[in-house]
């Protein structure tokens, strides 16, 4: 099993015609991820590596049906509106790769996601991956590199640093220890999902036997995680 994403996960890319989004779209497709559509207002009718582009999230869903997730790669000033659009159209998993978003706007996105039963990963993250099944975001880089670093197995990964997420996976793989799911949670002060919020997912996953965590100084997330582990005797 896995957490959050698997071989059946479908997602869109908001801001798909931007340079970074074009790259991550190709990397995800090459890995085998199921990107059903992209969104860039005013660019409907184009395609990016065979992925059709639409003017809005609603149009993607109208054409392809319900979509599990969205990767948002738009300028900071447009990120909140993009996230709101995805959430209000029923998208439940949102990966925000954009950085330098005002904290107040991040807080507003996280609040709306909570109210609507959606989950945000990021901002300022590389996304997440279930090895051999699906990756959302630029995590791992090109497909060949991703397949070399990430292999299927019993270790979950949570990391503030996108680069260290892959470094940890590579080290584990070299030691013969594959990964269930790896999540780059984001390096900003305010993010959508903390270590403690991911723990119940890993705890409920029978495939995950241990978790590797990479943290960075500052914030309360580590203390919250310790409290969760103590309370739940994990």
Name the predicted role of every residue range.
Residues 1-234:
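Catalytic-core regions of core metabolic enzymes
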